[in-house]
């Protein structure tokens, strides 16, 4: 049998069925996971192309393999498009993920046991910002700043106090669960005061930055990292940006040969396609709608009596504090999942429960906004979520409410067909 000519169904019916069933799931659930989105057919086509066959260690025109003329063109397009999108001088599009983008910065700018100062995990920071289980917490001396105990906003006074006290080599401004804007200018002043590098991790808000809906870190941060999915709506991957081309040289060497080998050229091509989509006028409207939808969802849940962390949102993230309701994040997320609404359990600031249980849930609006949802739809979603949470407050067995909401979800999703 010539396996090169077999389609997926002929070659592997098990994987074919898994993909088919996942497609059905994605078409029929309300996707509220803040880090997820739906890519275009064009991005899928590039990602599934024969560019996956090509090995291309190195950088355009400086490869360790021959036959890279076409993939060089793809990478150059991705670089030029992302530089235009963020108005910056340097870009590296080779990181396989946001985590590897962050690791590359650490490898380029730090030495083992150097001090880094980042947001604590329970305040909304990311594992790669110095959390103990992560390599960043094992290789470096990590210090964490927190949000204010009353407002749940970043405590810039504490950031400055800790920076002066611990003299970090790197200050990290970024998050994975923080619903408000970040003042990168303030972070840069603090970094300069102690002679630290400033890294901005904009994995969640990259789309907002690119469209002017959030302050850009490019003029302030020495280096900026991001994922290429989430609000950028591209394939899963990472990128690194800077206006300092000398730092860019260090980044290039740290990524290859320091951290990675061959880049994934099919993913880089898909990134280029997504970046072209991001440069279209429609993308600005999309991001505005993402933010408006998040605000509508937050208000809808507040009107049903639920506590929204910080009292609202400035981006795509809505965090619900369930402590007063006596519901764990795990229980809420599982019940919502059974009702056709996917989100994730999430720690809230100063959470005393296990990270596998949590006292909150996190919602995000990018995915459903891609499908065409507007504010009125998110108001309805808010009521669906509240119905599930109300049921959990009064019954251990929430199955009847889950089935009722699941029926409503199915009706709603029929109005928003996506992947044919």
Swiss-Prot record:
It is found in: Cytoplasm. It holds the Pfam family SHMT. Catalyzes the reversible interconversion of serine and glycine with tetrahydrofolate (THF) serving as the one-carbon carrier. This reaction serves as the major source of one-carbon groups required for the biosynthesis of purines, thymidylate, methionine, and other important biomolecules. Also exhibits THF-independent aldolase activity toward beta-hydroxyamino acids, producing glycine and aldehydes, via a retro-aldol mechanism. This is Serine hydroxymethyltransferase. Homodimer. SUPFAM superfamilies: PLP-dependent transferases (SSF53383). Keywords: Amino-acid biosynthesis, Cytoplasm, One-carbon metabolism, Pyridoxal phosphate, Transferase. The record marks 229 as: Plays an important role in substrate specificity.
């Amino acid at each position: 049998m010539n396996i090169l000519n077999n389609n997926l169904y002929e070659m592997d019916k098990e994987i074919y069925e898994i993909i088919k069933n996942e497609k059905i799931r994605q078409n029929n659930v309300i996707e509220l996971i803040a880090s997820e989105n739906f890519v275009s057919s064009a991005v899928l086509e590039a990602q599934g192309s024969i560019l996956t066959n090509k090995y291309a260690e190195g950088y355009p025109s400086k490869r360790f393999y021959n036959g890279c003329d076409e993939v060089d063109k793809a990478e150059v397009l991705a670089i030029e498009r992302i530089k235009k999108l963020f108005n910056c001088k340097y870009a590296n599009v080779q990181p396989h993920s946001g985590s590897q983008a962050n690791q590359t910065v650490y490898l380029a700018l730090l030495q083992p046991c150097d001090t880094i100062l980042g947001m604590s995990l329970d305040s909304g920071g990311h594992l790669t910002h110095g959390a103990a289980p992560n390599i960043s917490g094992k290789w470096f001396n990590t210090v964490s700043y927190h949000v204010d105990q009353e407002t749940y906003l970043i405590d810039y006074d504490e950031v400055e106090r800790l920076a002066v006290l611990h003299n970090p080599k790197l200050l990290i401004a970024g998050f994975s669960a923080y619903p408000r804007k970040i003042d990168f200018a303030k972070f840069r002043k603090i970094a300069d005061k102690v002679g630290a590098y400033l890294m901005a991790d904009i994995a969640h808000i990259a789309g907002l930055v690119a469209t002017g809906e959030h302050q850009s870190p490019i003029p302030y941060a020495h280096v900026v990292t991001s994922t290429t999915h989430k609000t950028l709506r591209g394939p899963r991957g990472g990128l690194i940006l800077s206006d300092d081309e000398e730092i860019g040289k260090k980044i290039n060497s740290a990524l290859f040969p320091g951290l990675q080998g061959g880049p994934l050229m099919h993913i880089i091509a898909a990134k280029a396609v997504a970046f072209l989509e991001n440069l279209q006028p429609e993308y600005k409207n999309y991001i505005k709608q993402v933010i408006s939808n998040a605000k509508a969802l937050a208000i809808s849940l507040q009107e049903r009596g639920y506590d929204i962390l910080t009292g609202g949102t400035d981006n795509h993230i809505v965090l619900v504090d369930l402590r007063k309701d006596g519901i764990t994040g795990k229980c809420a997320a599982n019940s919502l999942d059974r009702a056709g609404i996917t989100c994730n359990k999430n720690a809230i600031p100063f959470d005393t429960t296990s990270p596998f249980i949590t006292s909150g849930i996190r919602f995000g609006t990018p995915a459903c906004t891609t499908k065409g949802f507007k504010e009125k739809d998110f108001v309805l979603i808010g009521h669906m979520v509240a119905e599930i949470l109300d049921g959990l407050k009064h019954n251990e067995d929430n199955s009847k409410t889950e089935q009722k909401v699941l029926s409503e979800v199915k009706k709603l999703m029929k109005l928003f067909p996506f992947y044919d």
